[in-house]
Amino acid sequence: EGNDNYISHFGIGHEAWNFNKNELIDGKVYGYLKADVSSLFSEKHNIFFFSRDSNGDLFFVGYYKDCKYLTEEERIKLKEKMVESGLLDKRINQVYRILKNEDDFSEWSWDDVESEFGFEVSSFKLEVLPENITIFENKIPFTEQDCIEVLEKGWQERYGNYTLIPDLDRFLSKFLMK
């Protein structure tokens, strides 16, 4: 479905839709974030996504520039739009088809998968313009100490596989120059 279709390139994973620029609502991508963090509501944020390999080594996957963390009211409206557009059912069906072939989840029904997406409030909490999404072609290795030096704060995985980037230019120059 085009060069920007993250899912066609990488499959469905924990937050596979975070980088899919083909499935827009009102011209924006809505990314998944596990944490509920009300302190993020009032301003735009730069957020990087990372993963760990089987050895526990860290790798940057990509980032959002100037994304907005949606309030609960905004997420309720988003959920309605996702239902109306058919996008929510499409995503639930993608996950359901994959899980039914996995031994640990083969007993799950479509309704079980649907319940994981939340009922009234969308679990997609980040709003970003497609042009403000970057996914790295090759994952970029880093260490916790690298982040502490650049972010000038202690390392934490408070938000799951994400952290906030106060100074995006400084951050990128440090890690893209490695």
Give the location of each predicted region:
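Short, flexible loop/turn elements at secondary-structure junctions
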Residues: 10-16, 21-23, 51-53, 65-71, ...
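Compositionally biased, charged N-terminal/linker segments
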Residues: 1-41, 174
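Intrinsic-disorder/low-complexity loop/linker signature
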Residues: 22, 27, 56, 137-139
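Contiguous surface segments at macromolecular interaction interfaces
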Residues: 1-9, 72-178
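Intrinsically disordered, low-complexity regions
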Residues: 3, 12-14, 28, 32, ...
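Aromatic- and glycine-enriched beta-alpha-beta binding-site module
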Residues: 32-74
